[in-house]
Amino acid sequence: MGIGGSDMYRQQILDHYKNPRNYGEIEDATFTHVGENQSCGDTIKMDVVLDDEETIEAVAFRGDGCAISQASASMLSERLPGTSIEELREMDRDDITDMLGVEISPMRVKCAVLAEKVAQDGAEIYLGERDLDTTQTEGDDPDIPE
């Protein structure tokens, strides 16, 4: 009996959670930013290296939390290299859902988008468009991409 599409994606999420890609840090990152989901305790710190044209060259992350938040960070760290900083800023919740391959329950959306939000906020801070110490995904956050 074959694995259904949804089961395959669930296995992929578990694989990224148990064997995260690009886990660690980049000492000479262009920017580093940290975020947390206070409602469940997920944390992600992300390092991003940009080239001279502001295209993402490398991403590393470290953190702690549920399978969805950590798998999302791992998958995003593989997806972002080769992406422009503008393309990163345009990503939204649907991009993360598509990347994960499963529907995310309303209670887990903040877990799923934490890494994306950390990367986007880090980019905005780098560009001088935002002054923020830590990304938060607590409460009704209007900045969580729809």
Set out the residue ranges of the language-model regions:
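Basic, gly/Ser/Thr/Pro-rich low-complexity segments located predominantly at protein N termini
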Residues: 29, 46, 68-70, 87
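Short beta-strand elements
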Residues: 42-52
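Short Gly/Pro-enriched turn/cap motifs at secondary-structure boundaries
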Residues: 34-39
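Alpha-helical support elements that line or immediately flank enzyme active sites
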Residues: 72-82
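C-terminal binding/interaction regions
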Residues: 1-27, 32-33, 57, 83-146
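Short, thiol/selenol-centered motifs that function as redox-active sites or metal-ligating centers
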Residues: 40, 63-71
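Immediate flanking context of iron-sulfur cluster ligation sites
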Residues: 54-63
